[in-house]
Amino acid sequence: MKKKTVLTILKKKQSGEKITMLTCYDYVTAKLISSQDIDVLLVGDSLGNVKLGYENTLSVTVDDMIYHTKSVKRGNDGALLITDMPFMSYEITVEDAVKNAARIVKEGGAEAVKVEGGIEIVDRVKAISDAKVPIVGHLGLTPQSINKFGGFKVQGRTEEERGRLIADAEALEKTGAFAVVLEAVPEQLAKEVTERLKIPTIGIGSGRYCDGQVLVVDDMLGMFTDFTPKFVKKYAEIGEMVRTAVKNYIDEVKKGQFPREENTYK
């Protein structure tokens, strides 16, 4: 596939062509997804939920992100590869932020990083961008702030929240972010932010007017069933297919129906 870059994504904003993004955490899935010419693979810290079985994303480490990014990198064919910076990898000091972003790029092979937050982290965003690491912002429902917000809640419904989100988005753009993810933001607010910014917005549960869309791959394939957000559309029921296949395998082994002659060596 033709290689996508940051410039590719920026040009799609200008042309009005929608940007496509999915999360990805491993080599095999990266091969499958990128074979369909997707624009962006995001190694999300959502791997804490869907791959590591954590209750939330807060326990995910930089080493976790590097490990999974390396796996995705080996399977990726052409997509821009972005990796989340996990909780407390950029909040404490600017130096930590740059150091950890550099590790994710140098050791993991990511081509950009993503951070959650607005005006309160713009010094980190600028420092990472100045260090020649492309960076994406993330506003609205920010899973790393679950304890601050008291759970996973739609953000931007009050006038105060609306004004803050717009200011945050503009601050991220001004300090070097090349795109912003908007999660669980009311559709009309996401539309307004998209129209105000020169950089692309990528929506997840934020309506139809963002410049692109992203979903957690395990959600849209029907593999992760612990919880399904309202905004998810399931394009397959892979989880049910796996359960059926495993049941059939167990039954055939117990009945002596597998392996058959064609599955043996002579």
Swiss-Prot record:
Catalytic activity: 3-methyl-2-oxobutanoate + (6R)-5,10-methylene-5,6,7,8-tetrahydrofolate + H2O = 2-dehydropantoate + (6S)-5,6,7,8-tetrahydrofolate
Gene Ontology cellular component terms for the protein in this record: cytoplasm
Keywords: Cytoplasm, Magnesium, Metal-binding, Pantothenate biosynthesis, Transferase
Recorded GO MF terms: 3-methyl-2-oxobutanoate hydroxymethyltransferase activity; magnesium ion binding
Family matches, as InterPro entries: Pantoate_hydroxy_MeTrfase, Pyrv/PenolPyrv_kinase-like_dom, Pyrv_kinase-like_dom_sf
Residues binding Mg(2+): D45, D84, E116
Subcellular location: Cytoplasm
One Pfam family named in its UniProt record: Pantoate_transf
Pathway(s) where this gene product acts: Cofactor biosynthesis; (R)-pantothenate biosynthesis; (R)-pantoate from 3-methyl-2-oxobutanoate: step 1/2
Enzyme Commission number(s) from the entry: 2.1.2.11
Cofactor, free-text remark: Binds 1 Mg(2+) ion per subunit.
Residue sites binding 3-methyl-2-oxobutanoate per the record: D45, S46, D84, K114
UniProt cofactor(s): Mg(2+)
Highest taxon listed in the record's lineage: Bacteria
Active site: E183
GO biological process terms held by the UniProt record: pantothenate biosynthetic process
Sequence similarity: Belongs to the PanB family.
HAMAP family, sorted: PanB (MF_00156)
NCBIfam families in the cross-refs: panB, PRK00311.1
Subunit details: Homodecamer; pentamer of dimers.
Role description: Catalyzes the reversible reaction in which hydroxymethyl group from 5,10-methylenetetrahydrofolate is transferred onto alpha-ketoisovalerate to form ketopantoate.
Designated name of the protein: 3-methyl-2-oxobutanoate hydroxymethyltransferase
UniProt organism field: Endomicrobium trichonymphae
Originating gene: panB
